[in-house]
């Protein structure tokens, strides 16, 4: 299928498809100057979308797809590889979630302090503009 149909079918823009091609995430066959997207491209784009939902970066996704494609892994090795990738990613996401939770708590405390300040009290938040 052609690039426009592929983009529409997968609910992405043509620019996104081209970006993924430039990064080597999808590898369509080029016939007479036009890209032709096959079932392998369909599978790859579904994998890309799924990994993006899991908050993997495009570079991480490329590493995963490249290793799966070129690594000549048997099923057990493939599972071990992905297990390690997922464990590392889980740890990073848990750390980010903890940091976001702490930041959210601090913002809520500041908001509460601000709201509890007397309304008619002037609060100096910066430089005087006069």
Pin down the residues of each PLM region.
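Polyanion-binding surface elements
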Residues: 1-14
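Short, Lys/Arg-rich nucleic-acid/phosphate-binding segment
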Residues: 30-35
């Amino acid at each position: 299928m052609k690039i426009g149909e592929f983009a529409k079918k997968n609910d992405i823009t043509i620019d996104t498809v081209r970006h993924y091609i430039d990064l080597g995430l999808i590898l369509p066959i080029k016939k007479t100057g036009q890209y032709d997207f096959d079932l392998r491209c369909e599978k790859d784009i579904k994998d890309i979308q799924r990994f993006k939902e899991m908050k993997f970066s495009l570079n991480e996704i490329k590493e995963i797809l490249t290793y799966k494609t070129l690594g000549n892994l048997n099923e057990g090795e493939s599972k071990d590889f992905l297990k390690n990738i997922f464990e590392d990613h889980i740890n990073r996401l848990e750390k980010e979630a903890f940091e976001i939770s702490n930041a959210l708590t601090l913002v809520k405390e500041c908001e509460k302090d601000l709201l509890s300040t007397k309304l008619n009290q002037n609060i100096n938040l910066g430089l005087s503009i006069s």
